[in-house]
């Protein structure tokens, strides 16, 4: 046994203990089973040479376990046998913004691709996050869209018809037992200039392999009321990079998170490239319990501080004047009005800067190569001859913070 393996096994053994100020989170590898969790949940996985396969999710608060029958790795983008697998554990202390957490890193190499899966395990949280990093060379599978109309599909009469599918790179995967799953996906939209309906939900029964859009997937067994959720930590579906057309794939009780947010050329041989993240959480009950579990995870990412997280904002773009009105005199007058209205944050939108965006009231604006213009994000000397100092000083006097687009 190598020295490296001895160190890894030693770390695996000690991290079952509450060594970090009583924080109850753990991750350890024992035999062929990798376990990680806290007071709320545990995720158990077959080690599989460093390409873990989930075998169960346990809800410790209710004493219930969702068994899995996985054969494929949770994360899979290339074929091959994993080698050079390692497992390490580190505590990441709080930085004043996020809560402290245990980072369990599973690394392996498949062919010319190095993979690191960095799990984030928070105390007293019914969810475990995973950030994935890639380095080396990879040729990602390009899915050819099936453009057939549903009217052109034949009936399912034979087992072979049900086995058809596509190769799908997966961020995470739960290959579960049971035949009574009910699911709901939530899709979000941005670009409020174009969208006034920012959230849509779809409830569905998993059946034959199908795809779904959204950043959230909730699923529960309608008999046992045991449930789990996937949170895809990525932009909204309509604005993701290299979007494959969906975020989730379900095939009966096999649930997958898809869409890495990268292309093959984004993976470099000498630096790590991070793909979109994924969070897996558990709950028992209905919608309230599911949303509570999700919220408990979200509260780990950012400590709530009223001074910085709560605000009543006034924005200079609000009357659709674009950048035509914004200047020093206008902003000083707006601050007086903001104080009378109880505004706590005055936000200077597009137009305060020297660079001209394509949204300008006057022609000639552009975002092209703006990083090459070192003066782009400096105060416009014509509109703000004294810089932003008079605006900031008056804001402080009135108890109003100043924000910038």
Give each language-model segment a name.
Residues 1-24:
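Bacterial Sec-dependent N-terminal signal peptides
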Residues 17, 265, 270-271, 396-405:
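Short, intrinsically disordered, charge-balanced linker/junction segments flanking boundaries
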Residues 26, 301-307:
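Short boundary motifs at domain starts and secondary-structure transition points
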Residues 307-405:
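Aromatic-lined carbohydrate-binding/catalytic grooves of carbohydrate-active enzymes
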Residues 2-4, 94, 231, 393:
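Generic cytosolic/nucleocytoplasmic N-terminal low-complexity/intrinsically disordered segments
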Residues 292-301, 385-388:
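Alpha-helical scaffolding within the catalytic cores
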Residues 1, 133-143, 354-362:
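Short regulatory "switch" loops immediately downstream of catalytic or recognition motifs
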Residues 23-296:
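N-terminal accessory beta-strand-rich subdomains and adjacent acidic, glycine-rich linkers
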């Amino acid at each position: 046994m190598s020295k490296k393996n001895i160190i890894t096994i030693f770390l695996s053994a000690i991290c079952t203990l509450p060594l970090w100020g009583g924080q109850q989170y753990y991750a350890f590898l024992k035999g062929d089973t990798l376990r990680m969790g806290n007071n709320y949940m545990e995720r158990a996985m077959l080690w599989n040479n460093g390409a873990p396969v989930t075998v169960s999710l346990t809800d410790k608060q209710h004493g219930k376990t969702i068994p899995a029958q996985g054969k494929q790795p949770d994360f899979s983008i290339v074929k091959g046998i994993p080698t050079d697998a390692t497992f390490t554990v580190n505590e990441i202390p709080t930085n004043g913004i996020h809560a402290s957490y245990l980072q369990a890193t599973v690394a392996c190499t498949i062919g010319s691709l190095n993979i690191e899966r960095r799990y984030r395990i928070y105390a007293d949280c019914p969810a475990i996050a995973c950030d994935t990093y890639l380095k080396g060379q990879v040729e990602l599978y390009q899915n050819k869209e099936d453009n057939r109309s549903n009217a052109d599909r034949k009936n399912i009469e034979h087992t072979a018809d049900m086995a058809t599918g596509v190769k799908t790179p997966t961020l995470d995967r739960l290959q579960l037992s049971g035949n009574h799953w009910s699911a709901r996906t939530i899709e979000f939209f941005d670009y409020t200039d174009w969208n006034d309906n920012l959230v849509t939900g779809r409830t569905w029964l998993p059946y034959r392999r199908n795809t779904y859009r959204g950043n959230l997937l909730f699923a529960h067994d309608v008999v046992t009321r045991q449930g789990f959720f996937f949170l895809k930590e990525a932009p909204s579906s309509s604005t993701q990079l290299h979007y494959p057309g969906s975020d989730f794939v379900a095939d009966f009780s096999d649930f997958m998170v898809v869409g890495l947010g990268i292309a093959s050329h984004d993976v470099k041989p000498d630096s790590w490239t991070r793909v979109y993240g994924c969070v897996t959480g558990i709950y028992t009950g209905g919608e309230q319990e599911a949303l509570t579990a999700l919220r408990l995870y979200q509260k780990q990412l950012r400590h709530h501080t009223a001074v910085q997280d709560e605000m009543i904002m006034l924005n200079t773009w609000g009357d659709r004047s674009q950048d035509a009105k914004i200047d020093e005199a206008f902003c000083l007058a707006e601050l007086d009005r903001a104080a009378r209205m109880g505004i706590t944050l005055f936000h200077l939108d597009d137009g305060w800067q020297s660079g001209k965006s394509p949204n300008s009231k006057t022609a000639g604006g552009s975002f092209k190569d703006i990083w090459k213009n070192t003066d782009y994000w400096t105060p416009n000397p014509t509109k703000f001859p004294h810089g932003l100092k008079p605006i900031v000083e008056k804001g402080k006097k009135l108890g109003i913070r100043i924000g910038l687009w």
